[in-house]
Amino acid sequence: MSGVVRTLSRCLLPAEAGGARERRAGSGARDAEREARRRSRDIDALLARERRAVRRLVKILLLGAGESGKSTFLKQMRIIHGREFDQKALLEFRDTIFDNILKGSRVLVDARDKLGIPWQYSENEKHGMFLMAFENKAGLPVEPATFQLYVPALSALWRDSGIREAFSRRSEFQLGESVKYFLDNLDRIGQLNYFPSKQDILLARKATKGIVEHDFVIKKIPFKMVDVGGQRSQRQKWFQCFDGITSILFMVSSSEYDQVLMEDRRTNRLVESMNIFETIVNNKLFFNVSIILFLNKMDLLVEKVKTVSIKKHFPDFRGDPHRLEDVQRYLVQCFDRKRRNRSKPLFHHFTTAIDTENVRFVFHAVKDTILQENLKDIMLQ
């Protein structure tokens, strides 16, 4: 029997070893399968979190014609929601302010000449020639020491009644709206150690090229505000920003009813804004998007209504052209008439984008409107 046992043992041992290997291989496959399932669950959970985040994200698109105040509004969002401008940004704004002053003053000197307005002081002819000789073809930043060389001429020119008269006729040519503010503050801005204040930053004018975004959080709700250039050459970029938007803030410069576009020097600026608004508000892409009209530059409108009749440029106006309430009502009606879908009201606000408290107050109301209209399933409290 012992021989049989030994024979059986020799036959059985290899079979047992092979079974163990098979059991180990099967166990490894099951482990790999469990790991694959775990990874799949992790990926699904991550994708679900991302989808929830996308649904929660409030994406606001700033649209409107050039120089309507979109970039200023975006800067206000940074200021209001606590994101300070760093040293690099301050230096860039300083460069922009120097450029605004030099270019704006050159425009005034040239306009005085073309409009045939005499100098109050004949010696300012030399100051004007000195300023007109300034060239910056390379577009390099103007250093404070260089800018200081022009400050005496700039100050003398701004005091001259000839330049002031040209400024009073600025609707007849293209002049940045911040030029007066900067020239009034020339003593401060002309210092070697000058750095822009928040108000200076808000008034610094540089055309937006491309797409600028700002992210902030309100009551745990993430907001993304997107600014794209409003000039005609920049509008083809708008379509890159349409995906996933929650709301459109459409900005209009309410005071520009007597001005023409810089691009063609022919089209009335308010008419251009109405045409763009009509295209946006009736686009099927935005049927479920809240569109809020911001009639901006209220501070300038208040002053302009006193002296410039809107009826001269818009003959269908009915009312007192020098009564602010009548002009405001007409402006809202002009844009409201462009809407083909009358099922929803037109939300609108008169704003002054350079006034931080005004923007803070208006955006608080706008935020509630946006969330009520588009994010009813999100609890803010």
Swiss-Prot record:
One of its GO terms (biological process) is in utero embryonic development. SUPFAM superfamilies: P-loop containing nucleoside triphosphate hydrolases (SSF52540), Transducin (alpha subunit), insertion domain (SSF47895). It is a lipid-anchor. Its main location: membrane. Residues 56-381 form the G-alpha domain. Signal peptide: none annotated. It comes from the Eukaryota. Mg(2+) binds at S71, T208. The modification Phosphothreonine is found at T208. GTP binds at residues 67-72, 202-205, 296-299, 353. Keywords: Cell membrane, Cytoplasm, GTP-binding, Lipoprotein, Magnesium, Membrane, Metal-binding, Nucleotide-binding, Palmitate, Phosphoprotein, Transducer. This is Guanine nucleotide-binding protein subunit alpha-12. The lineage of its organism: Eukaryota, Metazoa, Chordata, Craniata, Vertebrata.
